[in-house]
Amino acid sequence: MRRVLYVDGFNFYYGVTRYWDKKKELAGLGWCDFSALVERNFPDAGKLHTKYFTAFPSVELPHHRPGEGGRYLLWRRALQTIGNLLVVEGFYKRDDDRRDQDTRGKRRIEKQTDVSLAVEMMADAFGPSDMRPEHVFILSGDCDQMPTVFALQERAPAPIRVTVLLPSEAERSEGWQDAYERTRRRLLKGHPSVRRNVLGSPVEVRVLDEKMLAASLLNYYLHDSEGSFECPHYWRLPTAYLDRQCRNSKWRPDLQG
């Protein structure tokens, strides 16, 4: 079975870090091995490919901690140690169109990431038959991707199993399902399903909880073609926490070698 995980990097980062850092000071749960996230929590046969959509923070903001670009590049380097992972980059644009003079230029907008994610999923689903995914994981809580899910479920040439992964427990799977069903009914009015007479499989929606994330961390000691490097201190979780949460000792991120 060909499986593909599509990750909205911005949505994952803010979903995990804002929820867990505010709740328990556990922003380090965002130091994620995305391949392990699927293989350990949703195991199945076949090779898994991961496509990660992000943007370099080229636009500096006055209220952000200095060194954001360097932190991004370190994370980008860590990402590349994950097997079968492709990074697709968009860009940031300063938000200078706001009418409020006090906030103008103090925010930035990520451009092309959402569109690139949707286009990539469509290109894969409608591509050569031997390359089409049979199971798609979408790691994003962005409701703007619901029409894409609809296209995968109702319009793709071959049925595709879809699993939506919501980045944090701040979101409810039932709420997403309800919103998707409303979107689906609306879209069916103008875009009839190519499988209208076939009972399609429902969209599976799973919330990434603390145990899933803690069991899917990148190692803190990494190596690539440029040499060895480590997870920075601000991403590391306390040893006592890892003792409690890592249900398999081999999955601990603080083990060297």
Q: Model-predicted segments: where are they?
A:
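Domain-level signal for Mg2+-assisted phosphodiester chemistry and nucleotide/NA-binding surfaces
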Residues: 1-111, 155, 160-168
